[in-house]
Regions:
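Short C-terminal tail/terminal secondary-structure segment
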Residues: 2-4, 158, 238, 249-263
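Canonical Rossmann dinucleotide-binding motif of NAD(H)/NADP(H)-dependent dehydrogenases/reductases
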Residues: 4-38
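Conserved glycine-rich Rossmann-like NAD(P)H-binding loop of the short-chain dehydrogenase/reductase
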Residues: 34-49
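Catalytic Tyr-X3-Lys loop
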Residues: 89, 97, 111-130, 145, ...
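Short, small/polar-rich loop/turn modules that mediate ligand/substrate recognition or access, typified
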Residues: 92, 185, 190, 248-250
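Substrate-binding pocket helix/loop in short-chain dehydrogenase/reductase
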Residues: 102-119, 218
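Active-site helix of classical SDR
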Residues: 133, 169, 177
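Alpha-helical segment proximal to the catalytic Tyr-Lys
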Residues: 138, 182-183, 246
Length: 263
C-alpha cells in the first residue's frame, strides 16, 4: 500500500522551524519524501542547523531567515524559496511568540501597557500568518493545489488570563484561516488549524522539575497525563499537509492531550 502521508511531489515551507515544534514538522516533511523543505526562522543559525540535519539525512532543505511580521521580509523569503524549488505546495504558519523575548512591558497587564508591547504578540502570531498566507496563495491558486496549516493555541480558543493579547492574536489567526478556507476551496486549497496546549520544551521541563507541585497541577489539566511532544503536533500537521487530507478544510484540530474536548 502506498504511503498516504507521503510528501513526494510537494515542497513545504515551515515558519519558526529552527527549534521545537517547527523543527519536528520540517523533519517530518523530509522523512516523508518532500521534494524540498524551506526551513524558516528569525535566527538564521537555528534554521541552518535544521536544514543541515535534513540534508545530512538525504533530504533536500534550505534555510531562509525572515521576520514573518515584516511583509517585505516575507515576500523576499518566498521569492527565494520559489527560485530554489519552483513552488510552495504546503505552508505551515508555525512561528509564534508567547513572550520568550518580549518587549520590556509585555508581562505587565495589557491595560497598563500600550501598542508597542502589544505588537510583540500581534506581529508574529497574527500579522505573520496573514503575511505568509498572502505570499503563498497566488502560486497555489495558479496551480490549483495547496495546503495551509496554522498553529494556534488553547489560549486562542478558550482564553488565558494574563495572555490577552497573545490569545487574541491566535484567535484572530483562526478566524482568518476559516475565511481563507471558505474562499480558497474553489481553487483546491485546504486551510486548517492545529490547536496545541502546553509543550514539553526543554525550558518548560526544567521549570516543572524545579517545582513538582506546580507541575502536578498543570498535568492534572490534561486527560493524558503528560505535556505535548513536538512529534505529536508534527504528526497532525503532516496529515493536513499531505494528500490524505484532500477533503478536509476549515477545521481546528486540538492536539492537547485532552485539555479540551468536544465529544
Amino acid at each position: 500500500m502506498d504511503n498516504i502521508l507521503s510528501m513526494q511531489g510537494r515542497v513545504g515551507l515551515v515558519t519558526g522551524a529552527g527549534q521545537n515544534v517547527g523543527r519536528q514538522i520540517a523533519l517530518h516533511f523530509a522523512a516523508h519524501g518532500a521534494d524540498g523543505v524551506v526551513v524558516n526562522d528569525f535566527v538564521l543559525e537555528r534554521a541552518q542547523a535544521v536544514a543541515d540535519e535534513i540534508n545530512a539525512a538525504g533530504g533536500n532543505a534550505i534555510a531562509l531567515q525572515a521576520d514573518v511580521s515584516d511583509h517585505d521580509s516575507v515576500k523576499a523569503m518566498f521569492a527565494r524559496a520559489v527560485q530554489k524549488y519552483g513552488r510552495i505546495d504546503a505552508l505551515v504558519n508555525n512561528a509564534g511568540n508567547a513572550g520568550a523575548t518580549p518587549h520590556e512591558d509585555a508581562r505587565k497587564p495589557f491595560y497598563e501597557t500600550g501598542p508597542e508591547a502589544w505588537k510583540t504578540f500581534i506581529g508574529v502570531n497574527f500579522d505573520g500568518v496573514i503575511n505568509c498566507t498572502a505570499a503563498a496563495l497566488p502560486g497555489m491558486i495558479e496551480r490549483k493545489r495547496g495546503k495551509i496549516v496554522t498553529i494556534i493555541s488553547d489560549a486562542g480558543r478558550w482564553g488565558d488570563p494574563g495572555m490577552e493579547i497573545y490569545a487574541g492574536a491566535k484567535a484572530g489567526a483562526a478566524g482568518f484561516m476559516r475565511s481563507v478556507a471558505r474562499g480558497m476551496g474553489r481553487h483546491n486549497i485546504n486551510a486548517n488549524c492545529v490547536v496545541i496546549g502546553a509543550m514539553g520544551t526543554p525550558m518548560i521541563e526544567e521549570r516543572m522539575a524545579k517545582d513538582p507541585e506546580r507541575a502536578k497541577r498543570i498535568l492534572e489539566k490534561y486527560i493524558i497525563r503528560r505535556l505535548g511532544k513536538p512529534s505529536d503536533v508534527a504528526n497532525m500537521v503532516l496529515f493536513l499537509s499531505s494528500g490524505a487530507s484532500d477533503y478536509v478544510t476549515g477545521q481546528m484540530y486540538p492536539v492537547n492531550g485532552g485539555f479540551t474536548f468536544t465529544l
